[in-house]
Regions:
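Class I S-adenosyl-L-methionine
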Residues: 73-85, 96-285
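Core alpha/beta nucleotide-donor-binding catalytic domains of modification enzymes
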Residues: 2-126, 137-141, 145-152
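Redox-cofactor binding/interface segments in oxidoreductases and associated redox assembly factors
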Residues: 91, 133, 301-302
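A residue-level signal for beta-strand positions that form part of recognition/binding surfaces
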Residues: 6, 186, 297
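Active-site donor-binding loop signature of nucleotide-sugar glycosyltransferases
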Residues: 59-61, 175, 302
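Class I SAM-dependent DNA methyltransferase catalytic core
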Residues: 212, 253, 262-325
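Acidic-residue sensor for enzyme active/binding pockets
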Residues: 35, 134, 325
Length: 325
């Protein structure tokens, strides 16, 4: 916390900084943000996420140099602004190796899963008042390789390393029950420094339960778009064109139906190889599926009422981005 009582945080695996946007709206100040891809950090720069350019740290969290840059920025805030301690560390390690949506898993995914170990290592060094880890539902039970080259469940690794200093709470929740406009089931792990055990518990961090919204309630008032059309009131509400032959796949679908359910071969998702129809592999049950207007929005696919994918504007509404962002 700074001299002026402003709460501080550090974001690991921060992507384009979407999650951090909410923290900034709540008055937190970002001491450092770490992301391996420069183009994602550039989005954060555009949104002025950090006050100082040194706060944008591009690099692999496994590298000592990257960790030292984060720790150096913490020291800078301590000396310059009286930050007695980082209040919050948030980490969302890559989940591709754990996600059921990833059908292209590689044999070395457990190494990528083990990036969470680097997060825990930094939390031990930073000693924040609180930390939050967020990931896929299987997160806590997924295997990782710890610093001693032992294979163990991520949950066990977290508890072994942090339970002596933090009260730990993990739960699988669906964010649709807490104000999100789409169905998103995730594991949350919340750590509260034991110094505060008599004052606060992890459960107090959860927002109040909210009634879920249907897709119609979220985007139903927006203007329908024709092929290639832009809404004159918002550039980002625009019809994203796609290969015309795909229209046959989706034009006759009813709400909730997938193009893979079409009975005619040429209306199923496919490609042409040697003048023959080769069907696409049916991996995700909701791919090429027309959404239901009176249900909570799933992952992003074909609209319910148009032969189109969602626009950037509707995606912002479904994913709860601030519309002015």
């Amino acid at each position: 916390m700074l001299f002026n009582q402003t709460l501080t945080y550090i974001s690991l695996f921060s992507g384009a900084g979407v999650g951090c946007y909410g923290l900034l709206e709540e008055g937190f100040e970002c001491v450092a943000t770490n992301e391996i891809l420069e183009k994602r950090l550039n989005v954060q720069r555009i949104n002025n996420k950090c006050k100082f350019n040194d706060g944008y740290i591009c690099g692999d969290i496994k590298e000592l140099e990257t960790k030292e840059k984060i720790l150096k920025q913490i020291e800078f805030y301590s000396k310059k602004f009286g930050n007695d301690r980082v209040d919050l560390v948030i980490a969302t390690p890559p989940c591709q190796g754990m996600s059921v949506a990833n059908h292209k898993k590689k044999n070395d995914e457990i190494k990528r899963n083990s990036l969470v170990v680097e997060s825990i290592d930094l939390i031990k060094q930073i000693k924040p008042r609180f930390f939050i880890l967020e990931n896929v539902p299987s997160f806590y039970k997924t295997g990782c390789i710890d610093k001693n080259d032992n294979l163990l469940e991520i949950g066990s690794m977290i508890e072994q390393n942090l339970s002596s200093d933090y009260m730990l709470y993990d739960e699988i929740i669906n964010f649709k029950n807490f104000g999100a406009n789409s169905s998103r089931t995730r594991t949350l792990v919340i750590g509260v420094c034991k110094e505060f055990k008599d004052f606060i518990s992890a459960l107090e961090f959860f927002p109040d339960f909210k009634e879920e919204k249907t897709l119609k309630e979220v985007i139903g008032s927006l203007k329908p778009l024709s092929w290639g059309e832009y809404d004159s009131t918002d550039f980002y509400h625009s019809f994203r064109t796609y290969p015309k032959h795909m229209q046959e796949w989706i034009k006759d679908l009813k709400e909730g139906q997938s193009a893979f359910e079409n009975t005619e071969l040429n209306k199923k998702p496919h490609r042409i190889v040697d003048n023959k129809i080769v069907l696409n592999v049916f991996k995700n049950g909701d791919k090429y599926k027309r959404q239901k207007y009176d249900s909570i929005a799933p992952c992003i696919h074909t609209r319910n009422d148009q032969m189109a994918s969602q626009t950037l504007f509707t995606l912002k509404m479904i994913e709860c981005f601030p519309l002015e962002s």
